[in-house]
């Protein structure tokens, strides 16, 4: 137990330190490359002052997480297979597969935006094709490792065998969740702070359920979130871009699936799901009513902006909601 605690502490500290230091060097480099964000014209007018803020800053914490896990591997390599076991090591690699694959799609999207100096990168069709291919690879990996099960533990209903229905729901659910995290990256520090809280949930869940690899990746990611907040907290000196938010989406989603507990995303990803559902509801209602809206603006954090809330207040509010979701999830694990 002491060995695992030191492993997790090293991952968290390493993730923080490497990401924070990476930002010190990467932000000036992004400035020199003119990799600035183009702000949406339909967004709040006061966001125009953010125009030109460096984007693709997610590279900082991707580097931080990758380097941290690599250092931990070298430091603990004689004992790591014994502590984790080969199945957990393989499952950990599968988490990184979805995370880095999603991050690569986000990187392509960001790169097109900065090269063309507009806020539209990959088309929706291009992004969907890439995500379908990536998700197929991830689910094939789950199947190969014996982690793809049709039995899901639902709150209240208990263990339910969904049969063949599970596969399409899981497939498109993964794509939905990755994009939901991407949608949450709309304000300075918002997605970073919410993901930090979500990772605390996964760290605790992994510890309670015996999935050390989940706790290890969550600890490194939580540390990296804290390190990135040094640069991304309001007023942000850098944005994570789709590179970072898609990467986070991959981690948030994959961690639940490799534990064979996808229902935990309902708790640990409550803010992302809420955010995405408001967009879906708004678009559906807008089309059905030929121009009417339910919310003043979506994703929903912007609706609070329109009410006059400051970004820091909105960040704190959604981090609190994420914390409540984590608390509910941990309680659910303990009583289920």
Model regions: which residues?
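Carboxylate/His-rich catalytic cores and anion/metal-binding grooves
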Residues: 126-140
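Juxtamembrane helix-loop transition segments at the membrane interface in multi-pass membrane proteins
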Residues: 34-35, 117-118, 243
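Membrane interface segments of multi-pass transport proteins and intramembrane proteases
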Residues: 115-123, 152-160
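Hydrophobic transmembrane alpha-helix segments characteristic of membrane transport
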Residues: 108-116
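Juxtamembrane helix-capping/reentrant segments at transmembrane boundaries
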Residues: 40-54, 117-130, 301, 306
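Alpha-helical transmembrane segments and immediately membrane-proximal extracytoplasmic
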Residues: 37-54, 81, 87-91, 213
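Alpha-helical transmembrane segments
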Residues: 1-31, 61-108, 136-143, 152, ...
């Amino acid at each position: 137990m002491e060995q695992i605690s030191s492993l997790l502490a090293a991952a968290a500290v390493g993730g923080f330190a490497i990401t924070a230091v990476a930002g010190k060097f990467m932000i000036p480099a992004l400035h020199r490359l003119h990799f600035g964000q183009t702000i949406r014209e339909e967004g709040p007018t006061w966001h125009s002052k953010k125009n030109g803020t460096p984007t693709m800053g997610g590279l900082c914490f991707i580097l931080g997480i990758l380097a941290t896990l690599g250092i931990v591997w070298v430091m603990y390599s004689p004992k790591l297979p014994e502590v984790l076991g080969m199945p957990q090591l393989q499952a950990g690699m599968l988490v990184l597969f979805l995370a880095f694959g999603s991050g690569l799609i986000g990187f392509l999207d960001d790169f097109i935006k900065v090269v063309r100096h507009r806020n539209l990168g990959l088309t929706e069709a291009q992004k969907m094709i890439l995500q379908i291919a990536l998700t197929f690879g991830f689910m094939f990996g789950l199947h190969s490792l014996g982690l793809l099960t049709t039995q899901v533990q639902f709150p209240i209903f208990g263990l339910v065998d969904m049969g063949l229905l599970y596969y399409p729901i899981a497939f498109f659910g993964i794509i939905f969740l990755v994009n939901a995290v991407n949608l949450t990256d709309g304000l300075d520090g918002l997605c970073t702070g919410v993901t930090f809280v979500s990772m605390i949930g996964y760290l605790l869940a992994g510890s309670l359920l015996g999935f050390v690899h989940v706790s290890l990746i969550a600890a490194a990611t939580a540390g990296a979130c804290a390190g990135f907040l040094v640069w991304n907290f309001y007023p942000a000196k850098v944005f994570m871009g789709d590179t970072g938010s898609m990467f986070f989406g991959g981690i948030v989603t994959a961690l639940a699936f490799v534990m064979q507990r996808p229902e935990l995303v309902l708790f640990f990803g409550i803010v992302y799901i809420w955010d995405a559902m408001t967009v879906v509801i708004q678009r559906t209602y807008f089309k059905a009513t030929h121009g009417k809206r339910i919310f003043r603006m979506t994703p929903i954090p912007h609706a609070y902006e329109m009410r006059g809330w400051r970004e820091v207040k909105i960040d704190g509010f959604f981090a609190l909601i994420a914390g409540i979701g984590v608390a509910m999830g941990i309680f659910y694990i303990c009583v289920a």
